[in-house]
Amino acid sequence: MRKDVKIYLNHILESIELIEEYTKDKTEDDFFTSKFLQDAVIRRIEIIGEAIKNLPMEFREKYNHIPWKEFAEMRDILIRKYFGVDLGLTWEVVKKDIPKLKEEILKIMEELDKNKNNKYNVFAYGELMKKERLLELINRVPKMIEGRVYGYEKFFDETIGYYGARKKEGSYIDGIILLDITDKELGIFDDYEDLDVYYIREKTTAVSEDGRKYDVYIYLRK
């Protein structure tokens, strides 16, 4: 199960700030001649890469202006070349790329803090329809209304033993619209559904029995 993205963002920010601390008032020559400094910086770049790899794909796609892949691969390159590190490249990353990444991470964290009170609607068609499951997961039963989504079908996935949904033109699924789900609760649902492992979360439109339309999230089998 994935952790809250803020945990990984904090890991990235912490490593960036430690790199800044390690290299403060240091020159390129200092870096080239200090094995201790090299090891400390490389280790932090490794941690940044590992944290990036654990960010959900949906999150990375939302902020796709950030070169996540390059930072994650940089970590792999450094590991492969551990006994022959390209010090020039590493120093360039420290002085040029790391400050840019820090700026972007701070912007994202500020945005997440502003959006933490956002509310969402979730279309449930399986376990999340059950009140006892909702109480177990989020300690409350949100307002629920019956609804339908078009262009999808519900099926029993024998590989994992649960119901899933997938796109299918001309089909529909009847279920429950869970209203006013908080950002934290949405994260709990993501974890419960093993987001990015077995399921993806997609925005769509659900229609209630009285014809009202709701923007909802639906979990689809990968």
UniProtKB/Swiss-Prot annotation:
O-di-AMP-tyrosine PTM positions: Y82
EC code(s) of this entry: 3.1.-.-
Superkingdom of source: Archaea
Top-level EC class: hydrolase
Listed SUPFAM superfamilies: Gamma-glutamyl cyclotransferase-like (SSF110857)
Annotated Gene Ontology cellular component terms: toxin-antitoxin complex
Motif RX(4)HXY motif, residue range(s) on this chain: 75-82
Classification via PANTHER family: RNASE MJ1380-RELATED, UPF0331 PROTEIN MJ0127
The record's account of how the chain is modified after translation: Modified by cognate antitoxin MJ0435; probably at least 2 successive AMPylation events occur on Tyr-82.
Protein function: Probable toxic component of a putative type VII toxin-antitoxin (TA) system, probably an RNase. Probably neutralized by cognate antitoxin MJ0435. Neutralization may be due to AMPylation by MJ0435.
One Pfam family cited in the UniProt record for this chain: GGACT
Keywords linked to the UniProt accession: Hydrolase, Nuclease, Nucleotide-binding, Phosphoprotein, Toxin-antitoxin system
Quaternary data: Homodimer, probably forms a complex with cognate antitoxin MJ0435.
Classification via InterPro entries: AIG2-like_dom, GGCT-like, GGCT-like_sf, HepT-like, HepT_RNase_toxin
Active site, renumbered: R75
Similarity comment: In the N-terminal section; belongs to the HepT RNase toxin family. In the C-terminal section; belongs to the gamma-glutamylcyclotransferase family.
GO molecular function: nucleotide binding; RNA nuclease activity
This protein's name: Gamma-glutamylcyclotransferase and putative RNase MJ0434
